[in-house]
Amino acid sequence: MTFAEEKTYKYIRYNHSKFCCVDVLEILPYLSCLTTSDQDRLRASYKQLGNQGTLWELFNTLQRRPGWVEVFIRALRICELPGLAEQVTRVYQSYLPPGASLHSLDPLQSPRIPTTVSEPSAFAAGHTIPDSGFQDKPGYPKPVQDTQPPKSPVENSEEPPQANFGAIPRMSGDSLISSPNPPALSPQPSREHPEQEPELGGPSTANVDSVPIATYGPVSPTVSFQPLPRIAPRTNLSPGVTVSALSAKTTLSSSSTGSAFAKGAGDQAKAATCVSTKEGVPTNSVTTSSVPSIKPVPVNTMSSKLPISTKSTAATPSTVPTNIAPSKLPINSVYTGIVPSKVTASVAKASASTMPPERNNKQAKETLEAPATVVTTGSSLTRPDISSRSLHSGPELSKPGVLVSQVDNEPFSACSMDLAISPSTSLGSEPNHGPEENEYSSFRIQVDKSPSVDLLGSPEPLATQQSPEEEEPCASSVSWAKWLGATSALLAAFLAVMLYRSRHLAQ
């Protein structure tokens, strides 16, 4: 705020009673130096405090804006308050530096009305906004829409390339305003876009300068939005494990009665193998997750009697198998890609034959109740279950149904050196008065009188609390006896004196 503006504000503050005739709601639209938030706040204050309470806040808000005096004088003249306008003009000119003069203070014909709803508008190329914030013409021309269909690339090639001599920034409400310093853009026809193909695996960039922008209004969506053609399909670079991801159809055949088909297309493939057994054992299903990968992995399954293996038709077979324990043993999930299983069909068959029939029946019942085993192959695998190795230990398999536990019958022996206790030298010959961490002080209590029978039945604190209560009646009885004796003595003396006087008067 300049010196002249400060003096003018002090004049308005000292002569505030002269400006009480100003209507806040009437003058607000003509104060272009105020922001939209200032006007909204003043209107809200007008509803709560009225015109007089809001007028003081109006002047406080005005004096924070540069050039507010000239705007205020112009607003006073528009609101038909020429007397106040002349007073403010005279005070303001008196404090201006020599040689400085006021700007044109003629009232505008059309005031600036704050717009609450933004409407789409398009200005002419040579149209500019005045510095004072007013608009000479309040009317807004309608945007020109291009309803013609887009021309073919052949027709575009026949036309000469159009060059944009001014950058037209996009404003809110789809309005176009020319920038004061337009940069020169390199003209290129739009037919060069189909020739530019995006690189595989890289970001596709479009040349912004090659798109001609119409100067007469916004372009229709059919012309402005034209997707570029894509030649090669998008490739997926995420690692993982999949079963025949590039093949269109893959057939998995098994040597037993069960068969399954798997079809893979694009980035995902799923394979499922269903195996049925002759003994009525539930079907073991193997599901391969649809995680994309480069190396195919075959899946091997074994039934209760005969091993059944399904081989993939991929070009490069893998040496890492996925095995499942036979149905005679407890079902455990075996994970692929960490440690290959060494249990073959012959070993599984031999272990199943050596087991007693009772255990076989129990295991058959357990496998009937157990859910289907699902083996999932993916990029991130966990460690195999260690509890499955403990099934092949010697003493546990030799004694089925019996838990063998080894108990050490030897007693525990230890010495005092094993105990972490700090040594204490309190019993030594030399006196040591320093504090010790684990040293405890002890004292001896000697009782000369043995406890009575009454004290054993009742706690000691109750006895100590009852003793004063018993002593109080004794003290009160002694005091009453003293008072009674003194009173009787006085009464006897009084009677003796009365008898003596009566005898003396009788004589």
From Swiss-Prot:
Query: CDD domains from the entry?
Result: CARD_IPS1 (cd08811)
Query: What spans does the record annotate as topological domain Mitochondrial intermembrane, numbered to this chain?
Result: 501-507
Q: Please note every region of biased composition (Polar residues).
A: 300-325, 374-391
Q: Where is the composition biased (Low complexity)?
A: 250-266, 281-293
Write out the ranges of the annotated region (Required for interaction with NLRX1): 10-77
Residues covered by the CARD domain: 10-77
Which keywords fit this entry according to its UniProt record?
A: Antiviral defense, Host-virus interaction, Immunity, Innate immunity, Isopeptide bond, Lipoprotein, Membrane, Methylation, Mitochondrion, Mitochondrion outer membrane, Palmitate, Peroxisome, Phosphoprotein, Transmembrane, Transmembrane helix, Ubl conjugation
- Topological domains annotated Cytoplasmic: 1-482
| Gene3D superfamilies for this protein | Death Domain, Fas
> Which is an annotated GO molecular function term of this record?
protein-macromolecule adaptor activity
> Which residue stretches belong to region Disordered?
123-238, 250-326, 350-401, 423-474
- What this chain does, per the record? Adapter required for innate immune defense against viruses. Acts downstream of DHX33, RIGI and IFIH1/MDA5, which detect intracellular dsRNA produced during viral replication, to coordinate pathways leading to the activation of NF-kappa-B, IRF3 and IRF7, and to the subsequent induction of antiviral cytokines such as IFN-beta and RANTES (CCL5). Peroxisomal and mitochondrial MAVS act sequentially to create an antiviral cellular state.
Q: What is this protein called?
A: Mitochondrial antiviral-signaling protein
